[in-house]
Regions:
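Periplasmic-binding protein-like
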Residues: 141-146, 209-213, 220-221, 253-286
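Bacterial N-terminal signal peptides that target proteins for export
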Residues: 2-13
Length: 361
């Protein structure tokens, strides 16, 4: 049986013969892939031309982004320093990925779905400098995204906005907020909509989100799993999705099968990045790890982000791709929820609002 295009891009099976090899990689959570710049040659990185390997522990829907970006970075680093660098990838639900680092997965860099997940890596001991968000522009968030809806051909349930997701008989697909960063963005986007519609009435927002999750038949652990449930397994009427994941589904499977619905209001999703200080200092990889994240802000890095449907921070690159992204009324987590620390504690920690309103199927 021929696998669908979505299965092929999710598994990232690359057979092109390139000067940059794509090998089988490692990682303790989710799937992995490795990019390398090829044979070692003379050059220097901190006084050494020895090949170096770094591990990027990332969240679910960045697989395609970092597959392309890693190839670009290793070429850039080879040309600049003469040094070969191998980038290994690990992908999964953002919260689960953070926990693997806490448990000893030696990530040189983390590129996760939200700031709280990076902060949580310091739960038991300080692995990352507490001022990590100040080390790179835009609070160490080189690209942004938002939350949209993916519906089936011709939108048979006529889904137009958040209110339609709580109607009787509508099946909504979204991941588990306890394990997935994207799911937490989805949840907060819905909560923020309900607040703004109901004059900041917290009780009405709670009732709205409770009703929404009553329409969720299954909670996958990560965003890519929910996409597979909706697209391949045919479950659900609407997928609440990262914008890039919705675009990717349409481009891989065709506009004749799915349609993106842009809600009247959504949340500005800011997925941050950081080196893991304890690991890079132990392994001696700080220079290349920092350069790896800094290059995300380069023109090439920003173009790669935009081509993979992440909204670039660079204004010139954003202008170039402005017709690709719909205009959406966005609010921030700081404006509505007082930041990730407060939102996590109130809504997603054990015994929080989500645990109170969600009834397991």
């Amino acid at each position: 049986m021929v696998k669908s295009k979505l299965t092929r891009f999710a598994l990232l099976i690359i057979s092109l013969v390139l000067s940059i090899s794509v090998l089988a990689g490692c990682g303790e959570s989710g799937s992995s892939n490795t990019s390398t710049s090829g044979n070692s040659s003379s050059g220097s990185d901190a006084g050494s031309s020895k090949p170096v390997t770094i591990l990027n522990v990332s969240y679910d829907p960045t697989r395609e982004l970092y597959q392309e970006y890693n190839e670009a970075f290793v070429k850039y680093w080879k040309n600049k320093t003469g040094q070969d660098v191998t980038v290994q990838q690990s992908h999964g639900g953002s919260g689960s990925q953070a926990r693997t680092v806490i448990d000893g997965n030696e990530a040189d860099v983390v590129t996760l779905a939200l700031a709280y997940d990076i902060d949580s890596i310091n739960k038991n001991k300080e692995l990352i400098n507490k001022e990590w968000q100040k080390r790179l522009p835009d609070n160490s968030t080189p690209y942004t995204s938002t939350i949209v809806f993916l519906v089936r051909k011709d939108n048979p349930k006529n889904i137009k906005d958040w209110d339609d997701l709580i109607k009787p008989g509508i099946q909504v697909i979204t991941p588990n907020p306890k394990t997935s960063g994207g799911a937490r963005w989805n949840y907060l986007a819905a909560w923020g909509y309900a607040l703004k519609k109901n004059n900041n009435d917290e009780q009405k927002a709670r009732e709205f989100v409770k009703a929404l999750f009553e329409n969720v038949p299954v909670l996958d652990s990560g965003a890519r799993g929910s996409t597979t449930t909706f697209v391949e397994r045919g479950i659900g009427d609407v997928l609440i999705a990262w914008e890039n994941e919705a675009f990717l589904s349409i481009n891989e499977l065709g506009k004749d099968k799915f349609k993106i619905v842009v809600p009247s209001i959504s949340i500005l999703a800011e997925p941050p990045v950081s080196v893991v200080d304890s690991v890079v200092d132990k392994k001696g990889t700080r220079e290349v790890a920092e350069a790896y994240l800094e290059y995300l802000y380069s023109d090439e890095g920003q173009e790669i982000a935009a081509k993979n449907y992440y909204r670039p921070r660079n204004e010139a690159i954003a202008k170039k791709f402005e017709n690709q992204f719909p205009k959406i009324n966005l609010f921030t987590i700081d404006e509505v929820f007082g930041g990730w620390g407060k939102a996590q504690k109130e809504h997603f920690d054990d015994g929080g609002v989500f645990d109170q309103i969600y009834v397991k199927k």
